[in-house]
Design a protein with these regions (language model features):
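Non-catalytic, conformational "gating/processing" segments within enzyme and secreted inhibitor domains
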Residues: 36, 78-235, 242, 260-342
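Short, cationic low-complexity segments
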Residues: 248-262, 343-348
């Protein structure tokens, strides 16, 4: 299938898209967080995988997906996603890849595959999905498209799987101002459980201060300024669980739009690394997507011919992040399996207890990754 490069498939991110995407990001993070657990999700990865799958849905299944994905109709979302992903991956820092794997026993609808190519530049594969060989091809595809950060997404294939839609993202960026050895000091981090541990903290003066009743934070730009690392530290008297529960798309947008630029922040941030993997079905059900996971109610009649009760049997999401003095490497992969059947002291921010962080696209202020670090 050839992809037409024309702009008919694009709509530039505007306020309507930003509101939908930030609300999806906040809900996904909030509904997936469980008390005290270090968590990392990539709203961009999950949104892309689900936006891709909704092109095969109809009826109430489609309506629920549209609502959960921020309330845009699917044609508009396809156009926004095309423009947004092209825009994000224009530099070297971020790579986004999509693929559709169809079991050799079924015929995927041409119109669905064409949309996957036109709007998501997806690679299309057809293979016996439950074979070990295909599982290993899928894992190598994910490993390659996350620069090796996520070596595998599935252990073995579900015998009932008729299609797998996979999104992979790799982010690798250096800080605009890297840390020197003299910027590193050993400080104590108090984890969610209260245990204390000495670890390497990176110290710097930043000049974008974030404040939101009950939390303080900062943004630290990566080289070229396209992306930034943002961290939010709830005040001592604010419980991190309550803070996360209070997040919303509007609140996220507001934190960034009211960022105080050129206001010095004395930052101390631990080096950290996190790997996370989750089966997202329960989270997505909390977000109102129900029929897609129910073999009786699911309507994926635009996905495959002879649609015999196709439903979503798995939504695997894996993420990885590493933040050190050089910069940040992060990756995410989402697999949707369709089964049938100058006064630095003014604003000190020391991330020495659980904190929320994001990798943000500075043009739209949308989080590509959002996580909470509860231990080091």
């Amino acid at each position: 299938l050839s992809s037409a490069a024309s702009d008919v498939y694009k709509r530039q991110p505007d306020d309507e898209f930003k509101a939908a995407a930030s609300s999806f990001a906040a809900e996904l993070f909030k509904d997936n967080y469980s008390k005290g657990k270090t968590t990392l999700v990539s709203p961009l990865s999950v949104l892309t995988a689900l936006a891709l799958v909704q092109n095969g849905a109809e009826g109430e299944t489609l309506a629920q997906l549209e609502r959960a994905l921020g309330g845009l109709d699917r044609d508009a979302l396809n156009k926004y996603m095309r423009a947004y992903c092209d825009f994000l991956s224009a530099g070297d820092e971020l790579k986004i890849a999509n693929s559709v794997w169809t079991d050799s026993s079924v015929e995927a609808k041409q119109a669905f595959l064409q949309k996957a190519v036109d709007s998501y530049s997806a690679q299309i594969f057809s293979a016996p999905l439950s074979s070990k060989k295909t599982v290993s091809s899928i894992n190598s595809w994910v490993k390659k498209n996350t620069d090796g950060m996520i070596p595998k997404i599935i252990e073995n294939a579900d015998r009932d799987a008729v299609m797998m839609l996979i999104n992979a993202i790799a982010f690798d960026a250096k800080w605009e101002t890297p840390y020197k050895r003299s910027d590193i000091e050993k400080l104590e981090f108090t984890s969610y459980s209260g245990s204390k541990k000495k670890t390497d903290f990176m110290c710097s003066t930043e000049n974008i201060y974030l404040k939101d009743g009950g939390t303080v934070g900062f943004m630290k730009p990566y080289k070229n300024g396209r992306f930034a690392f943002a961290a939010l530290l709830p005040n001592e008297d604010v419980n991190i669980d309550d803070y996360i529960a209070s997040l919303s798309g509007e609140k996220l947008m507001k934190i960034f739009s009211s960022a105080k630029k050129n206001e010095e922040v004395d930052v101390k941030m631990p080096k950290f690394k996190a790997e996370y993997s989750t089966q997202l079905i329960d989270t997505l059900k909390k977000m109102g997507i129900e029929d897609a996971f129910d073999r009786k109610s699911a309507d994926f009649s635009s996905l495959i011919d002879k649609n015999d009760g196709a439903y979503i049997g798995t939504v695997m999401h894996k993420t990885f992040i590493e933040v050190d003095q050089e910069g940040t490497r992060a990756a995410a992969a989402t697999l949707v399996g369709i089964s049938k059947m100058s006064m630095p002291a003014i604003n000190p921010v020391c991330l020495n207890r659980p904190f929320v962080y994001m990798i943000v696209d500075t043009e739209t202020n949308l989080p590509l990754f959002i996580g909470v670090q509860t231990e080091i």
